[in-house]
Amino acid sequence: MLTAVVGLQFGDEGKGKFVDYLSGNINNIARFNGGANAGHCVQHGNLRGSFSQLPASLNKKNLYICQGALISLPILVKEIDFIKKEDIDSHIFIDPRCHIVLPLHAELNRASEKYKGKQKIGSVGVGVGACVEDKANRHGIRLIDTFDKEKLRSKLEFLWSIREKQINHVFNAQASLDFEEMLETTHQYGKRIEPYFTFTNEIIGDLLNSGEDVLLETSQATFLDNSFGTYPYTVAYQTLVQTCFAMIGIPAQKMHIVGVMKSYMIRVGNGPFPTELSTEQADYIRERGNEYGTVSKRPRRCGWLDLSLIKHAVKLNGVIELAITNVDVLAGLDEIKVAVAYEIDDKLVCCDNALLQLDRAKPIYKTFKSWSTLNSSYTDLTELPIELIDFLSFIQDYTGVPIKYISYGPDRNQTLVVK
């Protein structure tokens, strides 16, 4: 059976921790979308890993990168080297149909953002958006193209001829890359990962047909989806969990979907954020939650939990249980607020409507008492402070979905499973 982990906010909800946690009982973990524009951090004891290409697991498992994923070769190789260095003897399978995010894409991305000025999206500048453009325009470079250096040269020359003109003459920047160096580096990295090449759709399809469990890791999050998110302040692809079937290449089927959410809201980059805090409360949350980008290292914008968005994300993805993270971060505040509805021009609006004009939406809040500093270990829900239990109960009632997992620290073991 398929189990999928999906983010219900703007990313950085803690999906990596729950992929790692759930992988303790599932041998096959697959990543099917996104690229190195977002990282998932996992920690077990003194071992800490950050993954933006490989599935986020510190367990010895079968790891699959499916054809919908976008590959930054130096980062992928670095992650492979990390798990080998730490003696995490996972078996890695990479689909050769994955498209490559080139240094040229990153340079184009940065030039585009600079050119847009105040209209910029706030991209981390990895180049994923430009890679998606090339894939859609049918002149992208895939992993399979790295085998033959002369074939790779021909494809890169064509792509270079288009993108260099765009950088120099459209965005008024100056392309600074060395073509021959990019060609050689891409070819050598391709040779390095060639032993892992596999048609992952066939393996995963066979596993599911034989009754095996497969855990899916969704990159980014619901409201960064370029159709249902806060467009245009989104990523360049779809992030809803049901896109997995096309991105992997398997038939649609039943899934067990775990929605991951933080106990507050964060956002990286530009875009509307109705519950954003600009007070010392934001600094308190940011420092206690270490809210700095895994990839960009930029300070994340912080705000109160927005349950209108969470409930909408639950419906969009078909979530059947929730995992909530960072409840320890809110401990010690005088009070905690939760947005339960929106007003625009003094009229209540539904979430779909609000998302079209979220910069104008005024949140309506419910206020909760905070709780004291949490312990280092819990075994039962009743051991938690009553104020936290009230907070969690309200989330369950509002969303209509049970909270199954409560994370109260970064370590894998700092997770309470609600029975």
UniProtKB/Swiss-Prot annotation:
Top-level taxon: Bacteria
The reaction(s) this protein catalyses: IMP + L-aspartate + GTP = N(6)-(1,2-dicarboxyethyl)-AMP + GDP + phosphate + 2 H(+)
UniProt pathway annotation: Purine metabolism; AMP biosynthesis via de novo pathway; AMP from IMP: step 1/2
Residues given in the record as IMP binding sites: D12, E13, G14, K15, N37, A38, G39, H40, R138, Q220, R298
GO biological process: 'de novo' AMP biosynthetic process; IMP metabolic process
Subcellular location: Cytoplasm
Sequence positions that bind Mg(2+): D12, G39
InterPro entries referenced in this protein's UniProt entry, alphabetically: Adenylosuccin_syn_GTP-bd (IPR018220), Adenylosuccinate_synth_dom1 (IPR042109), Adenylosuccinate_synth_dom2 (IPR042110), Adenylosuccinate_synth_dom3 (IPR042111), Adenylosuccinate_synthetase (IPR001114), P-loop_NTPase (IPR027417)
Pfam families the record matches: Adenylsucc_synt (PF00709)
Protein name: Adenylosuccinate synthetase 1
Gene coding for it: purA1
